[in-house]
Amino acid sequence: MRLVQLSRHSIAFPSPEGALREPNGLLALGGDLSPARLLMAYQRGIFPWFSPGDPILWWSPDPRAVLWPESLHISRSMKRFHKRSPYRVTMNYAFGQVIEGCASDREEGTWITRGVVEAYHRLHELGHAHSIEVWREDELVAGMYGVAQGTLFCGESMFSRMENASKTALLVFCEEFIGHAGKLIDCQVLNDHTASLGACEIPRRDYLNYLNQMRLGRLPNNFWVPRCLFSPQE
């Protein structure tokens, strides 16, 4: 297996089955972050991830981390917190602020460069990338964003600045997603945080099969319309 150099003149990707085993899932480098190429990548189960100053790297790891929304693990303490939550949760109210928050709230550095921010903002304007926002009064305290593929949502990143705020974002989104025929959330690579919330690993081949089925599914036409999903009890 060898790393494939992408052409700037074609948005085609090699098969994910040809990705390297070490580092796990590295498939190709180069190309660009145009909307057409990004959408082609997500349709093939591929995503970009690279450090500032490096070429664009494209990945499709095996196994793949996913979260079945109905399997989201919410602790008893979180359930109690949510019943009296001070947070308001919205969808697609402030995509730019969310991705900027994800880019800046990383002590260890971030792969979300200015070029990445601009690329996903273009996807948002085209109706493919979406955000969930958590507010404490008028302050944005957490958020997450990702790319929709039919009834599958490819989560990209999240940030949190207050207790339980990012968990609130995921909890409310999962409830809304399930309630409107959403099936699966792609978490890309498992980490301690996503594992604690119920994410698990499945073989890449299984993920690609789910993706090929679910990206042809449809959520209600108005699902991604900017709106409030949850308000604190008065």
From Swiss-Prot:
Keyword DNA repair among UniProt keywords: no
Cell compartments where the protein resides: Cytoplasm
EC numbers for this chain: 2.3.2.6
Catalytic activity: N-terminal L-lysyl-[protein] + L-leucyl-tRNA(Leu) = N-terminal L-leucyl-L-lysyl-[protein] + tRNA(Leu) + H(+); N-terminal L-arginyl-[protein] + L-leucyl-tRNA(Leu) = N-terminal L-leucyl-L-arginyl-[protein] + tRNA(Leu) + H(+); L-phenylalanyl-tRNA(Phe) + an N-terminal L-alpha-aminoacyl-[protein] = an N-terminal L-phenylalanyl-L-alpha-aminoacyl-[protein] + tRNA(Phe)
Domain of life: Bacteria
NCBIfam families found in the cross-reference section: aat
Name of this protein: Leucyl/phenylalanyl-tRNA--protein transferase
Taxonomic classification: Bacteria, Pseudomonadati, Pseudomonadota, Gammaproteobacteria, Enterobacterales
Gene that encodes the chain: aat
